[in-house]
Amino acid sequence: MAQINPTTLDNVKILGEVSDKPLLSKATPRDILTKDALKFIVLLHRSFNETRKQLLENRQKVQERLDAGESLHFLEETKYIREDPNWKCLPTHPKLQCRKIEITGPPDAKMIVNAFNTDVFTYMTDFEDSCSPTWNNMIYGQVNLYDAIRDRIDFTNEATGKRYKINREGRRVPVMIVRPRGWHMVDKHILVDGEPISASIMDFGLFFFHNAKFLLSQGLAPFFYLPKMEHYKEAQLWNDIFCVAQDCLEIPRGTIKATVLIETLPISYQLDEVLYALRDHSAGLNCGRWDYMFSTIKRLRNQKQHILPDRHQVTMTVPFMTNYVKQLIKICHKRGVHAMGGMAATIPIKDDPEKNAAAMEAVRQDKLREVLAGHDGTWIAHPGLLPTALSVFQEHMPTPNQIHVQKNVEITEADLVDTNIPDGKITMKGVSANIYIGLNYMESWLRGLGCVPINNLMEDAATAEVSRLQLYSWCKHAVKMDDTGKTITPEFISKLIDEEAERCAANKPNNKFKIAADCLKKEINGHTEVAEFLTTLLYDDIVTIGPEVDISSLK
């Protein structure tokens, strides 16, 4: 068979609309999906997609071993990396030395302006868990970022009269970090050689191609957050992509800096290896707490001894979460990079000062625990949390970071799966909360919203994933509720899901609660395999395939 030129656009199809109409900024999708940009992402896809698929297969082999009762281990093959005390990552970019408070949110125009106008140090703009990957969200997200870094977003909300423009006068503007979608995601609106393009490569490639050189001209660089990895070879894959991408644009290797989210159980056994794989490009590791909890439930779902109680009892102070944090901070600081803390998802409660004060105190305690543990910065989901979080970090970490603080802790293989929670209980309230959060988040996601306020918390896919997998594992193991003594069965949970979906749908025209309920019930009833991710489970419902775009008409 003749080899395909990796940069040719033969056998490439675009099935999403490539509009020439601006929405809330100056650029349009036609400025993003140019022929040269398309060639660039197609080259990366053709070069690396087979490796990506093999690594996803490897995840399933790990799951099969865990299902058979095996345990996770530190890898023998990479012992030499862990035990070598001498190697360190290259120094990070000067603009990333101080990351005390990071704000996160999807790349829609309003969120981008609000984030840049908040006096945080860094802003993670998110194509992943806080963004429903509709074609419009993804392509206009790229448009918005292109215009934001060039200071070309300026619009007025007609309904409120509020003007949205980034304020750059006399202040330090937050440094932007981009999170592409994870390795498990594809985008069905672009086909390469008959298969959907890797969503990770699409998100990374379009942003890097259009913006890397401009960012360098501003004294910045292309910075990324890398999500959902489960093996150090997945980090090696990112490193290989970074090297090729930089070579293609004639940018020095090591220019890109990337922070890896440690949000899966298997990769917590390979932290040294992840940093080593990305040592020229690393900006540290981050504790993705909710996804980590979800991954722990998912990977250990067939081991009854690891069933977790109601989600509100699974805090950062329980053994397996505490041990993962200690391990991450120790290894990051040993290798000379940042160890970032997790998300405070609280939303200020404007109409109840007493409840709001209690919520802010909980945030303060959470951030105090993080900074005293040794974290170099933390995440917030709402600008209203900035004063609370910042005051804690300024008081206890007056330096830009605390990488110099080395803690001598030894975490064993068993410590990372110590899911014993004294007095942990599974209750009707916990069941109901999981159903309510799961349904409401899934329904919003199906309508194109990936970041949803529920019960005074800003929920993204990670918290809904915890709900989904807890319901599944409680049903699978026929757990008895501690408060009622009733056994949790698929029939019982399905009935509750239907009742809650009906309640939620009342007075909400054009809602998608039935689709959400059906998806949730299929897994619980064993009619389908447990999906690796909610986003892959629901993705086909948001795909909007249109007429094939004439590629010769692109810029």
Curated annotation (Swiss-Prot):
Q: What induces it?
A: By ethanol.
Biological process according to GO: glyoxylate cycle; tricarboxylic acid cycle
Sorted alphabetically, which keywords does the UniProt record give? Answer: Glyoxylate bypass, Glyoxysome, Peroxisome, Transferase, Tricarboxylic acid cycle
Q: In the Enzyme Commission scheme, what number(s) does this protein have?
A: 2.3.3.9
Q: Which PROSITE patterns match?
A: MALATE_SYNTHASE (PS00510)
**InterPro entries attached here?**
Malate_synth_C_sf, Malate_synth_sf, Malate_synthA, Malate_synthase_CS, Malate_synthase_TIM, MS_C, MS_N, MS_N_TIM-barrel_dom
Q: Name one GO molecular function term.
A: malate synthase activity
What reaction is this protein's catalytic activity? glyoxylate + acetyl-CoA + H2O = (S)-malate + CoA + H(+)
Query: What is its pathway?
Result: Carbohydrate metabolism; glyoxylate cycle; (S)-malate from isocitrate: step 2/2
Q: Where is the active site?
A: 179 (proton acceptor), 460 (proton donor)
Enzyme class (EC, first level): transferase
A GO cellular component annotation in the UniProt record: peroxisomal matrix
Give the domain of life.
Eukaryota
Predominant place of localization: other
According to its UniProt record, where is this protein located?
Glyoxysome
Name the NCBIfam families for this protein.
malate_syn_A
* PANTHER family named in the record: MALATE SYNTHASE, MALATE SYNTHASE 1-RELATED
Q: Which family does it belong to?
A: Belongs to the malate synthase family.
Q: What is this protein called?
A: Malate synthase, glyoxysomal
In its UniProt entry, the species of origin is given as Pichia angusta (Yeast)
